[in-house]
């Protein structure tokens, strides 16, 4: 999960405004989701699965962003869990990875709550806002999430 240190702006507060965001996921290696409130359909954030690899890997990398005004209410916990479930059940993935800056306590708490395990540290991992940033690498598998995906024959290595 590459958590971008940016909050969503008012211009991105409708589904229509997210069309550009969603269009970039119209390829087999990426999927994008908008996290909305159930009652009002107000957008509270977005989640994406990038670098989807098939064959013997069956994996992807998560990214997300949220409105600062909606943090601490469990919306991203629920939204991210739904995307994780979708990745394991609907997409048949086996593993999801999250890369998080070490000082991003909110994001670290989120993945810990969802059952991710810390796997390592990547120095100068991603170029953000003019600087190379270190990241911690976290991951979860379908078994760890107790959502076992059943691969189809077409998903198996040849």
Task: Annotate each language-model stretch with its function.
Residues 32-158:
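Acyl-donor (CoA/ACP) binding surface of acyl/acetyltransferases
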Residues 21-34:
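A short helix-loop-beta-strand connector motif used in the catalytic cores of GNAT acetyltransferases and
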Residues 1-20:
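Conserved GNAT-fold acetyl-CoA-binding loop/helix
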């Amino acid at each position: 999960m590459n958590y971008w240190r940016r909050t969503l702006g008012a211009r991105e507060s409708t589904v229509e405004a997210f069309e550009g965001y969603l269009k970039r996921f119209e390829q087999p290696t990426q999927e994008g989701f908008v996290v909305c409130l159930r009652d009002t359909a107000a957008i509270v954030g977005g989640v994406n699965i990038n670098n989807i690899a098939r064959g013997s890997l069956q994996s992807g990398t998560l990214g997300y962003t949220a409105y600062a005004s909606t943090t601490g209410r469990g919306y991203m916990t629920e939204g991210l869990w739904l995307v994780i479930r979708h990745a394991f059940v609907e997409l048949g993935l086996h593993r999801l990875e999250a890369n998080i800056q070490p000082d991003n306590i909110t994001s670290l708490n989120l993945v810990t709550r969802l059952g991710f395990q810390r796997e390592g540290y990547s120095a100068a991992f991603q170029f953000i806002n003019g600087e190379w940033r270190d990241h911690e690498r976290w991951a979860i598998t379908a078994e760890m999430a107790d959502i076992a995906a059943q691969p189809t024959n077409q998903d198996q290595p040849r």
